[in-house]
From Swiss-Prot:
Record-level Gene Ontology MF annotations: phosphate:acyl-[acyl carrier protein] acyltransferase activity
Domain of life: Bacteria
Pathway stated in the Swiss-Prot or TrEMBL entry: Lipid metabolism; phospholipid metabolism
One Pfam entry name: FA_synthesis
InterPro entries associated with the record: FA_synthesis, Phospholipid_synth_PlsX-like
Record bears the keyword Cytoplasm: yes
The organism of origin for this protein: Streptococcus pneumoniae (strain 70585)
Subcellular localization, as worded in the UniProt entry: Cytoplasm
Protein EC: 2.3.1.274
A GO CC annotation given for this chain: cytoplasm
Function in brief: Catalyzes the reversible formation of acyl-phosphate (acyl-PO(4)) from acyl-[acyl-carrier-protein] (acyl-ACP). This enzyme utilizes acyl-ACP as fatty acyl donor, but not acyl-CoA.
Protein name: Phosphate acyltransferase
Alphabetical keyword list: Cytoplasm, Lipid biosynthesis, Lipid metabolism, Phospholipid biosynthesis, Phospholipid metabolism, Transferase
Subunit annotation: Homodimer. Probably interacts with PlsY.
């Protein structure tokens, strides 16, 4: 049985969206058990599942504006902290939260703990491409600064994930840069390039540019945390902008535009779904001793369900243990 500790109080629509997503996951997956951490009375309002689920009550939670590290240290009974401790103590196999990203990263670093020989765990997510296959990118902001050695580790981590969780036999690994030529980039990018070229275990395809990411140029894209987070926000903003422009064009375009939208309704719905990468799951803090997964703060029940499905696959494929063995040299 795969045991998942869930912070029921994190996120914009908690606990309703969290619990409703859990209900659906428990219905569909008979091999998971969920521990819900949070306000028992509020959780029970939405909990319909009666088997393989438990509630661990706490009145304390971490708010979105709390300073991450201080919150983890001072709010010992917060729902997120208790969920992370359950993983550390072996009472759960993975932790999920839609709450404060920085606090969850801190919980992953300081409570769950790093895998031996991994210097800086990175935040990774599967982002959308035009062909619907997506690409994995890390680091998306777990670290403000990185070395070439960190980026090399991210390439190995991302490749492991793409192989074992997404089923890609030979993941194409690209280094995000300001040009595709091998001579491009600052000293960090140039040093990283040399490390990736020298690693024969990687299917390294060279430098990739941000403009080509959504065209599926690579299966795994490696970046420092600052750059990766900026790219992530750009993709999110572009997706919202496209949908906003379409809505404005339709509502302000008169009868012809509305009729056209009606005819294209299924296609537009498909486009919206394709741009909504939360259907794939959450962002994984990769490099810690167990799956620590952050679903978007505005996640609805469907996104929570998708993230639980993602965690289930990670546990099923034992990707974290495989990664630990690889980095420990066993």
């Amino acid at each position: 049985m795969k045991k998942i500790a869930v912070d029921a109080m994190g996120g914009d629509y908690a606990p309703q969206a969290i619990v409703e997503g859990v209900n659906q996951a428990l219905s569909d997956f008979s091999d998971i058990e969920v521990q819900l951490y949070g306000d028992e009375a509020k959780i029970k309002q939405y909990l319909t599942a009666t088997e393989r689920v438990s509630i661990i009550h706490t009145d304390e939670k971490i708010d979105s504006d709390d300073e991450p590290t201080r919150a983890i240290r001072n709010k010992k009974n917060a729902s997120m902290v208790l969920a992370a401790k359950a993983v550390k103590d072996g009472e759960a196999d993975a932790v999920l939260s839609a709450g404060n990203t920085g606090a969850l990263l801190a919980a992953g670093f300081f409570i769950v703990g790093r895998i031996k020989n991994i210097d800086r765990p990175g935040l990774m997510s599967t982002l959308p491409t035009v062909d619907g296959k997506g690409f994995d990118m890390l680091d998306l902001g777990a670290n403000a600064e990185n070395t070439a050695q960190h980026l090399h580790q991210y390439a190995v981590l991302g490749s492991f994930y793409a192989k074992n969780v997404r089923g890609i036999a030979q993941p194409r690994v690209g280094l995000l840069n300001n040009g595709t030529e091998s001579s491009k980039g600052d000293p960090l990018r140039k040093e990283t390039y040399e490390l990736l070229v020298a690693d024969e275990s990687l299917n390294f395809i060279g430098n990739v540019e941000a403009r080509d990411l959504m065209n599926g140029v690579a299966d795994v894209v490696v970046a420092d945390g600052f750059t990766g987070n900026a790219v992530l926000k750009s993709i999110e903003g572009t997706a919202m902008g496209i949908m906003g422009l379409l809505k404005t064009a339709i509502t302000g375009g008169g009868l012809r535009a509305k009729l056209g939208a009606l005819l294209l309704k299924d296609s537009l719905r498909g486009l919206k779904k394709q741009l909504n990468y939360s259907d794939v799951g959450g962002a994984v803090l990769f490099g810690v001793k167990a799956p620590v997964v952050k679903t978007h703060g505005s996640s609805d029940a469907k996104a929570v369900y998708s993230t639980i499905r993602q965690i289930r696959t990670m546990l099923e494929t034992d990707v974290v243990a495989q990664t630990a063995r690889e980095f420990s040299g066993e």
